[in-house]
UniProtKB/Swiss-Prot annotation, chain B:
Record-listed Zn(2+) binding positions: D211, H212
The species this protein was found in: Oryctolagus cuniculus (Rabbit)
Domain topic, free-text comment: The WSXWS motif appears to be necessary for proper protein folding and thereby efficient intracellular transport and cell-surface receptor binding.
Annotated region described as Disordered, given as residue ranges: 326-375, 454-492, 568-593
Designated name of the protein: Prolactin receptor
Compartments in which it is found: Membrane
Residues annotated as transmembrane: 235-258
Length: 227, 616
């Protein structure tokens, strides 16, 4: 992942000359401050790749949750307890389309970053804890591992995008702290299962949020709201 | 008083009835929220199924509260979604939020509450089907025509802003087909279909799916008629090609049918059967005696004029037991064995010889007039009666050895039939005969002779009659007939006479294969038999009749003198069953079918094969 992103950056110079000739009508973007034409092309690629990653992460998260629920917690009504229990709920993210469209794209990008950062820690621990489960389910474990890796890649890409869209301004790295680790390690089987259930439930939701936001941003930034 | 009591009773009764009716009602059953759907991830609707209504009008209310809130709300819209539904508008819809929804059923008797349903709009998105499905057949130049399918996303879904990303799927089929052909179209709102059957009417449908949601239902069918692409010219070309290929197929079938056998034999050559070395049965059958004999390394047959000296052979047969057969040698007889000892050891295939001890003892020791004591393979000829100047014609056809002892029939004993040597058994070189067979015949003859002698000592016929066997060797190149010429011995017992035996001498063999037999004038016989004066000799070239089986009566050509003699002799014969039989046969033969007569070089030949067929 790191290599890929650096390759992208390195190709900027190469594309500069060709893009001067090729690039014609594209959405006028106020977000490339230097006015370099190549900025748009690479941004489009960055966004395309980001959307692909976020879409993939949510798909994996949804599958992982469904498998876990079916296998361990089906019919036990854990959902009733998993109300308002995600650690990222404190982050004031838009709750519907109108709110999301009203928010500025920079803020929206920042929100995406915050959510992504908030999940670094939980994903890491999720992998270790799922591995430690007795009868570690392979499907769930492999998905957890991949989600963790993709999430890291997406975070890097998003930081690059932000660097292009909003260069120069580096905001404080705000994110929600996850404190659910002790719950994952509890001795009580039921409590532990619920902790996992809750974590996976929140992961599914937040990955969907990120995916939705990035698609909104892509259509807005790259295609001028004309996807 | 009594009226009051009566009315009281009636009242009470009515009261009881009312109470009973009232007891039939009950609180409503528990409703059940069975489905919640959002068509565009901005609004959603929930539907419930009411429980038993308890016989009373029931009021349903839907209440909910959201995740992170404590306020309980009631359904904002019971109408839009239809009966027993609740529609949540945009204002009331939050994404990534769990709704806890319950339905209350209330009637006069009571109320009941459904189980709460936890709904997150994020995961219940099911859009409407795409709209404006249009079909168009496009005919680009230099390319095959194709069907261009276009559609629009459902009206409510916001794809432009990216709020929802839709993926499409189309399916089509010819009108009468049973199976749909499905194609995934991705995120594009158009599709090109290339593989179409011209002249068919196609039905097309499309549906869509949000990036993380459910597939919509299929859109209503759109139909289009594909124009027939084939021009008349194409059809003509195909008809022509079909006709041409049919003709070619028929020609091939005909050729295979005609030449099938030869082709098969070419591919699978027939396995050759066991063959006697140097002997070819097919040549034998076809009458190619020359080729056959040449395989043996034989000389030409029939012998040419040069071979006349070869043919001066005769046998002296005496009825006296002491008399020995004196085989005559031909001078220039080349080839195996004049004498038993001269047998070519190398060329012994199938040919027995009198060298074989058993045969030798039997034959050579018996001095009887055994006509079968042949040393000369050429012609075995039986000395005939005085009148028996027989000329026989070589009928250079198949070899067969048949003979008969006529006098056997007189004795009543069964006439033995010389063993019929199959052509295949004749592996001797021409003009050599199968000595072994001869010897066998001789032995059998001897036995018969002995019997005959014993039975009728008075007759000296023992030695007289000999069955002459005639072997005919394939000589000519003539194909065709497998005629067997017979040398006659036919003599019957009637011919037995005390006269001294006559010898018939083979005078010569004509070029066309006719044997000329000379009546031997002298006792010593004419050895050389060089072309004697034909005038003094009588040529027996005519077959008068066939007697018994396989005995030809040859007649002197010019005259019927001998014929008369023969006939008389026939009549003199003591009647015997077989004699009668022979007469019958003769009579039948006298009217031999004319078609059995063969004309060859002025000589009449009867084809014994005809007789054979008629006999058997």
């Amino acid at each position: 992942p790191l290599k890929t992103w650096s390759h992208q950056a390195g190709s900027l110079l190469l594309l500069l000359v060709s893009n001067l000739l090729l690039c014609k009508s594209t959405a006028s973007l106020p977000i490339c401050p230097s006015g370099a034409v190549n900025c748009q092309v690479s941004l489009r690629d960055l966004f395309d790749r980001a959307v692909i990653l976020s879409h993939h992460i949510h798909k994996l998260s949804s599958e992982m949750f469904n498998e876990f629920d079916k296998r361990y917690t089906q019919g036990r009504g854990f959902i009733t307890k998993a109300i308002n229990s995600c650690h990222t709920s404190s982050l004031s993210t838009p709750e519907d389309k109108e709110q999301a469209q009203q928010i500025h794209h920079e803020d929206l990008l920042n929100m995406v970053l915050r959510v992504l950062r908030s999940w670094n820690d939980p994903l890491y621990h999720l992998v270790t804890e799922v591995r430690g489960m007795q009868e570690a389910p392979d499907a769930i474990l492999s998905k957890a591992i991949e989600i963790e890796e993709q999430n890291r890649r997406l975070l890097e890409g998003m930081e690059k995008i932000v660097g292009q869209v909003h260069p120069g301004i580096k905001e404080n790295e705000i994110y929600s702290v996850w404190s659910g680790l002790p719950s994952l390690q509890m001795a009580d089987e039921d409590a532990r299962l619920f902790a996992f259930y809750n974590l996976l439930h929140c992961l599914r939701r937040d990955s969907h949020k990120i995916d939705n936001y990035l698609k909104l941003l892509k259509c807005r930034i790259i295609y001028d709201s004309n996807c | 008083m009594k009226e009051n009591v009566a009315s009281m009773i009636v009242f009470l009764l009515l009261l009881f009835l009312n109470i009973r009716l009232l007891k039939g009602q009950s609180p409503p059953g528990k409703p059940f929220i069975f489905k919640c759907r959002s068509p565009e991830k901005e609004t959603f609707t929930c539907w419930w199924r009411p429980g038993a209504d308890g016989g009373l009008p029931t009021n349903y209310t839907l209440t909910y509260h959201k995740e992170g809130e404590t306020i309980t709300h009631e359904c904002p819209d019971y109408k839009t979604g239809g009966p027993n539904s609740c529609y949540f508008s945009k204002k009331h819809t939050s994404i990534w939020t769990i709704y806890i929804i319950t339905v209350n059923a209330t009637n006069q008797m009571g109320s009941s509450v459904s189980d709460p349903r936890y709904v997150d709009v994020t995961y219940i998105v099911e859009p409407d089907p795409p709209v404006n499905l249009t079909l168009e057949v496009k005919h680009p130049e230099d390319r095959k025509p194709y069907l261009w399918v276009k559609w629009l996303p459902p009206t409510l879904v916001d794809v432009r802003s990216g709020w929802l990303t839709l993926q499409y799927e189309i399916r089509l089929k010819p009108e009468k087909a049973a199976e749909w052909e499905t194609h995934f179209a991705g995120q594009q709102t158009q599709f090109k279909i290339l593989s179409l059957y011209p002249g068919q009417k196609y039905l097309v449908q499309v549906r869509c799916k949000p990036d993380h949601g459910f597939w919509s239902v299929w859109s209503p069918e759109s139909s289009i008629q594909i124009p027939n692409d084939f021009t008349m010219k194409d059809i003509t070309v195909w008809i022509f090609v079909a006709v041409l290929s049919t003709i070619i197929c028929l020609i091939m079938v005909w050729a295979v049918a005609l030449k099938g056998y030869s082709m098969v034999t070419c591919i699978f050559p027939p396995v050759p059967g066991p063959k006697i070395k140097g002997f070819d049965t097919h040549l034998l059958e076809k009458g190619k005696s020359e080729e056959l004999l040449s395989a043996f390394g034989c000389q030409d047959f029939p012998p040419t004029a040069d071979c006349e000296d070869l043919l001066v052979e005769f046998l002296e047969v005496d009825d006296s037991e002491d008399q020995q057969l004196m085989p005559a040698h031909s001078k220039e007889h080349s080839g195996p064995g004049m004498k038993p000892t001269d047998l070519d050891p190398d060329n012994d295939s199938g040919r027995g010889s009198c060298d074989s001890p058993s045969l030798l003892s039997e034959k050579c020791e018996e001095p009887q007039a055994n006509p079968s004591t042949f040393h000369t393979p050429e012609v075995i000829e039986q000395p005939e009666k005085p009148k028996a100047n027989v000329t026989h014609t070589w009928d250079p056809q198949t070899i067969s050895l048949v003979g008969k002892m006529p006098y056997l029939s007189v004795n009543g004993s069964k006439s033995s039939t010389w063993p019929l040597l199959q052509p295949g058994q004749h592996n001797t070189n021409s003009p050599y005969h199968n000595i072994a067979d001869m010897c066998k015949l001789a032995t059998s003859l001897d036995k018969i002779d002995k019997d005959a002698l014993q039975s009728s000592k008075t007759t000296e016929a023992a030695g007289e009659e000999k069955a002459t066997k005639q072997r005919e060797v394939e000589s000519s190149h003539s194909k065709a007939e497998q005629d067997t010429g017979w040398l006659l011995p036919k003599e019957k017992p009637p011919f037995i006479s005390p006269k001294p035996l006559d010898y018939v001498e083979i005078h010569k063999v004509n070029k066309d294969g006719a044997l000329s037999l000379l009546l031997k004038q002298k006792e010593n016989g004419d050895q050389t038999g060089k072309a004697g004066t034909p005038e003094t000799s009588k040529e027996y070239a005519k077959v008068s009749r066939v007697m018994d089986n396989n005995i030809l009566v040859l007649v002197q050509d010019p005259g019927a003198q001998n014929v008369a003699l023969f006939e008389e002799s026939t009549k003199e014969a003591p009647p015997s069953p077989s004699q009668n039989q022979a007469e019958k046969d003769l009579s039948s033969f006298s009217t031999a079918p004319s078609d059995c007569r063969l004309q060859q070089g002025g000589l009449d030949y009867l084809d014994p094969a005809c007789f054979m067929h008629s006999l058997h």
